[in-house]
């Protein structure tokens, strides 16, 4: 089966206070479009954990200490040709030094055998 990936779903975790800013940046960069609808996204509450090491430059936390933060996990659809631009715009407004980003290829139902 030879299926070409045309769209992906991008997931990113964001501190709750930055969710709207990240959503706006991503959707302004042409992600979140489904048919005739724009700014389409899903947001799920989550609890993030991490320990910044001595070389890290943490957003507001202490180095070498387990941190817990309430986050939103945003997900949105993106055309494969726009992914790099969308990620660039996302990183401009995301407060984390190393945002957690997942990119999942999607298969259109009409492309299934």
Name the predicted role of every residue range:
Residues 1-113:
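Hydrophobic structural segments
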